[in-house]
A protein has these predicted regions:
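N-terminal localization/anchoring segments of enzymes in phospholipid and broader phosphate metabolism
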Residues: 2-576, 594, 598, 608-732
C-alpha cells in the first residue's frame, strides 16, 4: 500500500497545481484488517482532514485574485471556523485524552497524537494567516482607504479627542478585577478579549489584574481624519470609511492602563482570550422541560473547561505562567498570537461601503411562478427544483408567504433549525396563524450556537398561537421541511418543500443549496407521517418515497450501493456520484470501497471532511474525491446512482456521517421527474465535477492538489458558470 508523504504543511505553487502537503501517520494492518476493509490506513482522521478544509479557506484569503475585502472575509471565516473547531472537536479530543479513552473512529489515531498534530498544523496555518494580515492585507487596505491603524499612527488632534472620549465614554464602563486571596480568579467568557496586567505597588509588591474589553462597545473606533475635534459626532460604525482611521478598542485601552491603577506601576500587560468547551450535552431523558434544559445548557457553557489560551506574542513569561496556572493549562494549549486577536470579528469591516474592493453581488433568478398567477395549479402539474443562490431564495419565501395568505390553505407545518435573526419565514407562520390556519413549527432548540435565538423564536411563535414542538427527545431534527395543506375542489391537496439547507434568508445568499417543491402524493404523505412522528407518538420505520433517518436512510443507501455493484457486474456501466459536505461514516466508506473494487466509477465531491482515501490500487483506484471552496459555501447534498440507465437521485439534508444517519431526523427526497434528474446531473453535478479553478483534488497520499486548467484547456469555474446560466435562464 502506498505511504503518506510530506513532513510538514506547505503551500506549493508549481506548474499546474497548488498543493497542500500534510504529514499523516501510517499504522500497521493485519491481513484480516485488509480483508474486511477495517485497516486504519484506509481512513483519514476527521479532525486532521477538517484542518485540510480550513487550509483551503485560508488559501482563498491569501489569493491575490481575490479583492481585498474578500480576502478579509475569508480570513475572518478561517478564524471563526478555527474557534468553533476548538470549542467542539478539540474539546472532545481533550476530554478523551484526559479520560485515557482510546479513539473509537476507524483511523485509530490516539487522542494524544491527534492533539499534537492539531497543534502543529494550527501553528502553521495561523502563522500564514497572521503573516498575510500584517505584511500584505492590512498594508494594502491602508493604501486603498480602509485604514486600520495603531494608536501611534494617529495625529495629535485625534489623540486629544480620544483622550476625552476614553475618559468620558470608556473609562466608566471598565471593571478591573484584582486577583488575590480576597478576589478569586474571575470567570472568563469564551472568546472575549481581556487584558492580564501585572502591577507593582509603592511597597514593591506584585499584583495581577484582569481587565475585560467591554463587548457592548464597538471594537472598531472610526475616527475622522480631516475634521475639527468638536465635530466628531460618532465613533460607531461608519460604512463610508473613506475619511476615517479605524482604531481597535483594545489598542486605545492599552494606552490608558496606568489611569486605572493610581498608586501602582504597570509592570507588564498582555491581551488574551480563552476558548471553552461548548460541546456540552443535555440529559434529555431526565429533563422535565426541554426548553428550560436548553436554556440551562447555554448558561453552563460559561463554565466549560478551557481548551485554548491565546495571548499576545510579546507577553512576558510571568503573565503566561500566571494564566496557565490559574486556568490549569498544559503548554500545548497555549498559543502566542501576532496581530489582532479574535479576528472573526473583522467580518464587520466587510460591510464598509467599498464595492470596488469586493466581488460584485449577484441577483438570483426570481421566478414569476411564486409571485403571481396560479402557483398551486402549476405545482399540481409538475415538480420544481430550485438551486440557491442562483435561484433566489425569495421563491421559497413567496411559496410560504402566499400559502399563509391563501384562504384555501388549511394548515402549514414547518421545521426550523437555523432561521436567522430576522426571519420572514417566522413572520409568515405568524401571519398564517392570525388568519386562522393550523400552524405547526418544529423548532430544534439544540441547534448548536443557535439555541438562544431558537428559544426566542419558539416563545414568539407560541405567544401567537402556533403549535410549537421543541425538537425530538434524543434526536436533533435537521430535516428541512414545509408542508402546506389546501382545500381544492372539495378535497384536500398537499404541497411540500424539501431542502438541503436552512430556512434562513441570510445564509441562502452565500450557501449553495437545493430545494424540491412537489405535490407528489406519496412524498406528501411521507412528510405528513413524519410530522406526526415529530409532534406526537406516531412510530414509523419505513416510508413510501423518502429516506428518513435514523430508521430508514443508512440501509437504503447501502442497498443502492450494493445494487450498483450488481448492475455493474452484469452491464459494466456502474457509476455513483455523491455531492455532500462531509463523508465520515465508516460503513458508507467501506461500501464505496467495495464498489470501486468491483469496477464501479465513483465520483465524490465533498466540500468539507472526507475520511475516504481515494486512488489506492486494488481498493479505491476507481474513486475520485474533489472539493470546491469558492465565493459561496457548497452546501447541497445530492446522491446519484446510474442504475443501468434507470438513474436514481436523492437530495436532502443528510451528510454521510454517523450523526446524520443514526442520531438525527434527516430527509432525503427522490427526484422523480426524469427531466429534472437529467438537468441536475448535466447542469449542476457535471459542471461542478468539471471545475478546474476552485477545485481541490484529494490524492492517495492524503495531499490535496488545487486544479488549474492546462494551457489549452478551458477554465471552468462552476459557481461563476451557475451565475451565468441563471442570468439567462427562462422562467420555470
Amino acid at each position: 500500500m502506498q505511504q503518506y508523504s510530506g513532513n510538514s504543511y506547505a503551500h506549493k505553487e508549481s506548474g499546474m497545481t497548488s498543493q497542500i502537503v500534510l504529514k499523516y501517520p501510517e499504522q500497521p494492518c493485519s491481513p484480516e484488517d485488509m480483508q474486511d476493509l477495517s485497516c486504519p490506513n484506509l481512513f483519514l482522521n476527521r479532525e486532521i482532514n477538517w484542518l485540510d478544509f480550513n487550509a483551503k479557506v485560508l488559501d482563498e484569503a491569501l489569493s491575490p485574485q481575490q479583492p481585498l475585502l474578500e480576502q478579509l472575509k475569508f480570513l475572518a471565516i478561517f478564524y471563526n471556523n478555527l474557534d468553533e473547531f476548538f470549542m467542539v472537536r478539540v474539546a472532545n479530543i481533550l476530554r478523551q485524552y484526559r479520560n485515557g479513552a482510546a479513539n473509537g473512529s476507524a483511523d485509530r489515531i490516539t487522542p494524544a497524537k491527534q492533539l499534537a498534530e492539531i497543534r502543529r498544523r494550527t501553528l502553521l496555518l495561523t502563522s500564514r494567516a497572521q503573516s498575510h494580515w500584517l505584511k500584505s492585507l492590512a498594508p494594502q487596505l491602508l493604501e486603498r482607504g480602509v485604514r486600520i491603524v495603531r494608536y501611534t499612527d494617529l495625529s495629535e488632534k485625534q489623540r486629544r479627542f480620544l483622550d476625552g472620549y476614553f475618559r468620558n465614554e470608556i473609562y466608566p464602563v471598565l471593571t478591573p478585577q484584582a486577583i488575590d486571596p480576597g478576589h478569586p480568579f474571575p470567570t472568563i467568557s469564551t472568546t472575549c478579549l481581556n487584558f492580564i496586567i501585572q502591577l507593582r505597588n509603592r511597597d514593591r509588591e506584585t499584583r495581577f489584574v484582569r481587565l475585560k474589553c467591554p463587548n457592548n462597545l464597538s471594537r472598531f473606533i472610526f475616527i475622522p481624519r480631516n475634521k475639527e475635534a468638536k465635530t466628531y459626532a460618532s465613533l460607531g460604525f461608519d460604512p463610508n470609511v473613506r475619511g476615517d482611521d479605524i482604531l481597535l478598542l483594545e489598542d486605545l485601552m492599552a494606552q490608558y492602563l496606568e489611569l486605572l491603577f493610581p498608586g501602582h506601576t504597570v509592570v507588564s500587560s498582555a491581551l488574551f482570550r480563552i476558548t471553552r468547551n461548548t460541546d456540552l450535552e443535555i440529559e434529555e431523558d431526565e429533563a422535565d422541560d426541554l426548553l428550560e434544559a436548553v436554556r440551562d445548557l447555554v448558561e453552563q457553557r460559561r463554565f466549560g473547561d478551557v481548551v485554548r489560551l491565546e495571548i499576545a506574542h510579546k507577553a512576558s513569561r510571568e503573565l503566561v505562567d500566571f494564566l496557565a496556572r490559574r486556568l490549569r493549562l498544559q503548554p500545548f494549549q497555549i498559543y502566542r498570537i501576532k496581530g489582532p486577536m479574535g479576528f472573526s470579528e473583522f467580518m464587520t469591516l466587510y460591510n464598509v461601503d467599498r464595492p470596488q474592493l469586493k466581488t460584485p453581488g449577484i441577483q438570483g433568478h426570481i421566478s414569476r411562478l411564486f409571485q403571481e398567477g396560479d402557483m398551486f395549479g402549476h405545482l399540481r402539474k409538475r415538480d420544481v427544483v430550485l438551486f440557491h443562490p442562483y435561484d433566489s431564495f425569495k421563491a421559497v419565501l413567496d411559496f410560504i408567504r402566499r400559502s399563509s395568505e391563501d384562504p384555501n390553505v388549511l394548515a402549514i407545518k414547518q421545521t426550523l433549525y437555523r432561521a436567522g435573526n430576522d426571519s420572514p419565514i417566522v413572520r409568515a407562520l405568524i401571519e398564517a396563524r392570525r388568519r386562522g390556519k393550523q400552524v405547526v413549527a418544529v423548532v430544534e432548540l439544540k441547534a448548536r450556537f443557535d439555541e438562544e435565538r431558537n428559544i426566542t423564536w419558539a416563545e414568539e411563535l407560541e405567544k401567537e398561537g402556533v403549535n410549537v414542538v421543541y425538537g425530538f427527545i434524543g434526536l436533533k431534527v435537521h430535516a428541512k421541511l414545509c408542508l402546506v395543506v389546501r382545500r381544492e375542489a372539495g378535497h384536500i391537496t398537499r404541497y411540500v418543500h424539501i431542502g438541503t439547507g436552512n430556512y434562513n434568508a441570510s445564509t441562502a445568499k452565500i450557501y449553495t443549496d437545493m430545494g424540491l417543491i412537489t405535490s407528489n402524493e406519496d412524498i406528501c404523505s411521507d412528510v405528513t407521517d413524519l410530522f406526526n412522528v415529530m409532534t406526537g407518538y406516531a412510530d414509523r420505520d419505513l416510508y413510501r418515497k423518502l429516506l428518513v433517518s435514523p430508521q430508514a436512510m443508512r440501509g437504503p443507501l447501502m442497498e443502492m450501493i450494493r445494487r450498483e455493484i450488481e448492475l455493474h457486474k452484469r452491464y459494466g456501466n456502474g457509476e455513483i456520484i455523491f455531492k455532500c459536505n462531509q463523508l465520515v461514516d465508516a460503513g458508507i466508506i467501506r461500501a464505496l470501497y467495495r464498489a470501486s473494487m468491483a469496477g464501479v466509477r465513483v465520483r465524490l465531491q465533498v466540500r468539507g471532511i472526507c475520511c475516504l482515501r481515494p486512488g489506492l490500487p486494488g481498493i479505491s483506484e476507481n474513486i475520485t474525491v474533489t472539493s470546491i471552496v469558492g465565493r459561496f459555501l457548497e452546501h447541497s447534498r445530492i446522491y446519484w446512482f446510474h442504475a443501468n440507465g434507470d438513474d436514481i437521485m436523492y437530495i436532502g439534508s443528510a451528510d454521510l456521517m454517523p450523526r446524520n444517519l443514526d442520531h438525527r431526523i434527516e430527509v432525503l427526497a427522490p427526484i422523480l421527474d426524469p427531466e429534472l434528474r437529467r438537468k441536475i446531473r448535466e447542469d449542476i453535478l457535471e459542471v461542478h465535477l468539471a471545475d478546474n479553478v476552485q477545485t481541490w483534488q484529494l490524492q492517495a497520499d492524503a495531499t490535496y492538489t488545487r486544479l488549474k486548467p492546462a494551457s489549452k484547456e478551458t477554465a471552468v469555474n462552476a459557481q461563476e458558470r451557475m451565475i451565468a446560466q441563471h442570468i439567462t435562464r427562462d422562467d420555470i
